[in-house]
UniProtKB/Swiss-Prot annotation:
Name of the protein described by the UniProt record: ATP-dependent RNA helicase dbp10
InterPro entries found in the cross-reference section: DBP10_C, DDX54/DBP10_DEAD-box_helicase, DEAD/DEAH_box_helicase_dom, DEAD_box_RNA_helicase, Helicase_ATP-bd, Helicase_C-like, P-loop_NTPase, RNA-helicase_DEAD-box_CS
Superkingdom of origin: Eukaryota
Region (Disordered): 1-43, 315-348, 792-869
Motif mapping: DEAD box: 221-224
Broad enzyme group: hydrolase
Catalytic reaction list: ATP + H2O = ADP + phosphate + H(+)
Free-text comment on this protein's domains from its UniProt entry: The Q motif is unique to and characteristic of the DEAD box family of RNA helicases and controls ATP binding and hydrolysis.
Localization, UniProt: Nucleus, Nucleolus
Naturally occurring in which organism (per UniProt): Aspergillus fumigatus (strain ATCC MYA-4609 / CBS 101355 / FGSC A1100 / Af293) (Neosartorya fumigata)
GO cellular component, one term: nucleolus
Leader sequence segment: none
Taxonomy of the source species: Eukaryota, Fungi, Dikarya, Ascomycota, Pezizomycotina
């Protein structure tokens, strides 16, 4: 048999590999190669380029392996779920999904830090669908998702429906405002996934006496907002009813202390997942800090927007384009567009403008005031704060995301869940009281290799917080123009003042607007009152930074022009600024009474003059000790504060705390404790900067307590009060009972009515047990609902029939006859071996009575005489 020729097929890159394939495995040496292809062989350079591009994913040109990017296919998901993910449009998992999904699939409890828009909903929905797989006939839900608002719950339900399209999982939505009877029917329908708000779900749990022992997968979505809205008691009660072998997930934008305590109590050895990009300052971010006075903050904000950022006034280009499109659509008869044009329009609308700026304010009163002021100045502005209505909040954020507005004025509480993909600038109108809050604010810009700027307004009272931030970042402090041109805005903390001419014009414009607009002036008054409360409730700066800030503020460089305006300000302007600064800080050595007496030569009011001199001498004597202490501090403020190591901070803070008490110092010197062997109950290498801050470097978080300590951050409430997580002791007057009652009753929905203790010991409203579920069961003629973990009804064949008689016309008549006889015997043996039961011979009293009546009738009939013919 002749040997066949080798395969004529060539490789993908027209490279013949038959020789390599059949070199050692050929049957004979007489095998003839196939004819060459008519196409000419390509050049070697082209072959090398194709091979390099084919192998680029596995290795680079230097030979070192390249880490492959993990996709959804590498996570071990089912085929139906992968199809649903592809249908949804997810091609590559987001960073939070890539880090969270594998941990969840390993049945570990997770605390994830993610903002709204980062893909966190799919991060917990995809593993939930993969774990539940299909509908279970056993009674009881297996998945529970708790959301803070109705809108977020609807969004989660939509994602669950879309990703679970290839399964038969049943999901229900239980939120406030819907009919309780309809929700009773939903729960009675044995759903697999429950998406609810805490208040309504707790109401249904108490009303229906639900058994939550079947829950295996629990998600607390936007947990920080859940605690802020006063759902702590409801969450504790719900958590008490869940089984111990559940898997709990907690997603939040920030980690307040109360949330960390809740996670420690409700989660079992959780894993903290947070992105390094959310805890670092980008190296592409440039920072500028401007020293201003309290009365100049509005003018400084307007000057930064006009002169530094070059923010255009009037409607944005996107809003004008949309108005033109709407006008053209009305004129056109055919309003349908091509698919490509629609996608192009959507893509352009979903990107903010190049001037997009976020302005952070302290309270919601500041947000309202700045919104009105900036709108008066002609800017396109959006605003968001914590207590804003959810629909209005969504509209305002969407306008900023799509480029309808250029400026977004927010508070820290409201901005923690907002994710803006492209952001150019961040302005800190009110300087943050913690370094972590500053990192959280400015982390929204300079992403994905883009450049970004942050501008901060620093008053004299904010200088200690600025020094805390400088110590936390470990960067050099540059005050004014003391270093000349050698300034790096991305690596240094550069401070200085704004040019006086432009700032004065902006301040004059603000003063004029406040005089003309009474509503704006009233808003400023309210904001000032809110600021007083905010100042009392914000965290205090470190004592060492407060001490150093006095020297920094009193220096001449503090009021000098910022190096950012070096090209715009000449030397003459710099001298003018110095002269104005000296005039502004001038204090006369004598009062007007002393000057007049010296000029006129009179000696009136001698007692008053002596009192003034005595007070002045007393103040000067008190200033001398402080000046002596300041002499011990080196003159180079920036050099002294630029690179402070941990050992320096330890020595500085420990010596400062010990110098207050000389007796304690003597006692420690004469103490019997040997420092070489004595172990203190407190760590001796902690510094205040480390306690208030967290390590921004990446690392493994093996212990949740340690990891959460580095990520914990409490935000002050945007209404001027304390942040969530602290007990409110406010009372209100109850008109009906004529007494003061706790306002906590209003938050849990009881409105001052009676509270009862739940299963966990927490107080819940007594109105949750109203009896409506019992009435619903009576209306629908339902008895007791099936117990949890009991399977549903399954059909089983229990009917018994007599065997058919064998057909004598069939060929297997004898065989079928024997089968019928055997079936009869089995039926008789199953009945106890006796023959089929006949009519019982024992008569009852009724049978006997009836029989007697019938017999008597027969007798009477038979005893009648016969008829005569």
């Amino acid at each position: 048999m002749p040997h066949r020729a080798a395969s004529p097929a060539v490789s993908e890159n027209e490279f013949d590999i038959t020789g390599a394939l059949f070199q050692n495995d050929s049957d004979s040496d007489n095998e003839q190669p196939s004819a060459k292809s008519k196409r000419q062989p390509p050049k070697k350079a082209f072959i090398a380029e194709q091979q390099t591009s084919a192998n680029r994913k596995a290795s680079n040109l230097k030979g070192r392996t390249v880490k492959k990017g993990g996709g959804f296919q590498a996570m071990g998901l089912s085929a139906n779920l992968l199809k649903a993910i592809a249908r949804k449009g997810f091609s590559v998992p987001t960073p939070i999904q890539r880090k969270t999904i594998p941990v969840i699939m390993d049945d570990q409890d997770v605390v994830g830090m993610a903002r709204t828009g980062s893909g966190k909903t799919a991060a917990f929905v995809i593993p939930m669908i993969e774990k539940l797989k299909s509908h279970s006939t056993k009674v009881g839900a297996r998945g529970l998702v708790l959301s803070p608002s109705r809108e977020l719950a609807l969004q989660t339900l939509k994602v669950v429906k879309e990703l679970g399209r290839g399964t038969d999982l049943k999901s229900v939505l239980l939120v406030g405002g819907d009919s309780l009877e309809e929700q009773f029917a939903m729960i009675a329908g044995n759903p697999d996934i429950i998406i609810a708000t805490p208040g309504r779900f707790l109401h249904l749990k108490v009303e229906m006496n639900l058994d939550l022992s079947s829950i295996r997968y629990v998600v607390f979505d936007e947990a920080d907002r859940l605690f802020e809205m006063g759902f702590a008691a409801q969450l504790t009660e719900i958590l008490h009813g869940l089984p111990a072998n559940r898997q709990t997930l907690l997603f939040s934008a920030t980690l307040p202390k109360s949330l960390v305590e809740f996670a420690r109590a409700g989660l079992q050895e959780p894993t903290l997942v947070r992105l390094d990009t959310e805890s670092k300052i980008s190296p592409d971010l440039q920072n500028a800090f401007f020293s201003v006075k309290s009365s100049e903050k509005e003018g400084a904000l307007l000057y930064i927007l006009h002169e530094v950022i070059k923010m255009p006034t009037g409607p944005t280009e996107v809003s004008q384009q949309r108005k033109e499109e709407d006008a053209s659509a009305k004129n056109l008869k055919n309003k349908k567009r091509k698919r490509a044009e629609m996608e192009k329009a959507v893509n352009t609308r979903e990107s903010p403008t190049k001037h997009s700026t976020i302005v952070f304010a302290a309270t919601k009163h500041h947000v309202d005031y700045l919104y009105s002021l900036l709108c008066e100045a002609g800017f396109a502005v959006s605003y968001v704060y914590g207590s804003l209505d959810q629909t209005a909040r969504k509209i305002q954020v969407q306008n900023f995301r799509t480029g309808m507005t250029n400026i977004l004025v927010v508070t820290d509480v409201a901005a923690r869940g907002i994710d803006i993909p492209i952001l150019a600038n961040v302005i800190n109108y009110d300087f943050p009281s913690q370094p972590k809050i500053f990192v959280h604010r400015v982390g929204r810009t300079a992403r994905a290799g883009r450049k970004g700027w942050s501008y901060s307004l620093v008053r004299d009272a904010d200088a200690p917080y600025l020094l805390d931030l400088q110590l936390f970042l470990g960067r050099r402090l540059v005050v004014g123009r003391e270093f000349g041109d050698q300034v790096n805005f991305a690596e240094d903390v550069v401070t200085g003042s704004l040019p006086r001419d432009g700032l004065s014009q902006s301040c004059e414009w603000v003063t004029k607007v406040l005089d003309d607009n009474a509503d704006l002036a009233a808003q400023r008054t309210v904001a000032a009152k809110g600021e007083k409360l905010y100042m009392r409730t914000r965290n205090a700066a470190s004592l060492e930074s407060a001490k150093r800030s006095k020297q920094v503020v009193s220096s001449d460089n503090w009021t000098s022009v910022h190096p950012l305006f070096q090209d715009e300000t000449s030397n003459l302007e710099a001298e003018r600024e110095k002269m104005l600064a000296r005039i502004g800080g001038y204090r006369p050595p004598e009062t007007i009474f002393e000057v007049n007496n010296r000029r006129m030569g009179k000696h009136e009011n001698v007692d008053a003059l002596d009192t003034i001199k005595r007070v002045r001498s007393t103040l000067e004597s008190k200033k001398k000790p402080f000046s002596d202490e300041d002499d011990d501090v080196p003159t180079g403020v920036a050099d002294n504060m630029s690179m402070a190591s941990d050992s320096e901070l330890e020595v500085t803070f420990s010596s400062y705390s010990k110098s207050k008490d000389n007796k304690a110092k003597k006692a420690s010197a004469a103490s019997f404790q040997n420092p070489e062997y004595f172990m203190s109950y407190t760590p001796n290498n902690t510094s205040l900067a480390e306690d208030r801050a967290y390590g921004v470097h990446s690392g493994t978080n093996s212990n949740f307590a340690q990891a959460s300590r580095s990520a914990t951050m409490d935000l002050a409430g945007d209404d001027g009060g304390r942040g969530f997580g602290e007990a409110r002791t406010l009372m209100r007057w109850d008109k009906r009972h004529k007494k003061y009652v706790a306002r906590q009753n209003d938050e849990d929905g009881s409105k001052g009515t009676r509270l009862v203790r739940g299963e966990s010991g927490a107080k819940i409203a007594a109105s949750f047990r109203s009896g409506r579920f019992d009435a619903w069961k009576r209306e629908n003629r339902l008895g007791r609902l099936p117990r949890v973990a009991i399977s549903g009804k399954r059909f089983r064949h229990r009917k018994e029939q007599a065997p058919k008689k064998a057909d004598p016309l069939r060929g297997d008549y004898e065989k079928m006859k024997k089968k019928a006889e055997l079936a009869k015997e089995r039926a008789m043996s199953k009945a106890g071996g006796a023959a089929p039961r006949g009519k019982s011979e024992l008569k009852s009293t009724d049978d006997i009575r009836i029989a007697r009546k019938l017999k008597q009738k027969r007798r009477e009939k038979n005893a009648r005489p016969s008829r005569k013919k």
